[in-house]
């Protein structure tokens, strides 16, 4: 932005019928700022997640979702919530009103959800039945039953994907054993990077740490 363009801005959602909703106001852009925007279709996201869950089930692999909810605090918890809702679709379709009344927000994960419905045996059982019918999940802690979708910030893509790649595409399952894993990354910045990395290692083999050296992570923080 030039000096003349610098100043406050707002983010506005314009609906198909022309209705405008201000999502955020007073966003400050000093001169020299590079501004970029993007959007994601919730319908396309849900369709993609449903397809990936189905493919994972068919392939007999673990389902895993890799996001960065610690940094992308607005977008990634919402995307995570869509994954929770899609994975437990029969539960949300059947008990939507009861879950809403209990204060369940899928963006907070399955762990928070289970805590809020712990006194409702019927819904608790429905969740277990739905999970049994879905592909097994990549686990954060197999011993404690903490899944990839329990807490949005438990699986951070910068750490989880390198670990999975290093393990040959295998992750920990609910049975406390390693299994081939479907890594779902609904992010067109991250996904191509890891896809290219995986293809490279398929061609060249694993890195030899004695000759490849190290790369320091300095920690670039976005505003």
Where are the regions that the model predicts?
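Extended, well-ordered protein cores
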Residues: 1-81, 90-223
């Amino acid at each position: 932005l030039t000096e003349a363009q610098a100043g406050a801005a707002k983010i506005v959602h314009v609906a198909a019928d022309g209705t405008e909703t201000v999502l955020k106001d007073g966003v400050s852009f000093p001169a020299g700022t590079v501004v970029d925007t993007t959007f994601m279709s919730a319908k396309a996201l849900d369709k993609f997640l449903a397809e990936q869950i189905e493919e994972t089930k068919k392939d007999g692999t673990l389902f895993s979702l890799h996001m960065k909810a610690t940094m992308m605090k607005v977008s990634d918890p919402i995307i995570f919530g869509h994954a929770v809702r899609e994975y437990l679709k029969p539960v949300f379709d059947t008990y939507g009103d009861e879950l809403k009344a209990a204060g369940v927000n899928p963006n907070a994960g399955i762990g928070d959800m289970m805590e809020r419905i712990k006194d409702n045996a019927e819904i608790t059982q429905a969740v277990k039945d739905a999970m049994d019918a879905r592909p097994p999940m990549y686990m954060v802690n197999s011993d404690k039953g903490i899944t990839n979708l329990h807490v949005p910030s438990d699986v951070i893509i910068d750490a989880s994907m390198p670990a999975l790649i290093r393990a040959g595409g295998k992750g920990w399952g609910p049975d406390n054993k390693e299994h081939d894993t479907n890594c779902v990354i609904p992010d067109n910045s991250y996904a191509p990077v890891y896809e290219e990395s995986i293809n490279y290692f398929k061609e060249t083999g694993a890195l030899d740490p004695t000759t490849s050296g190290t790369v320091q992570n300095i920690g670039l923080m976005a505003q």
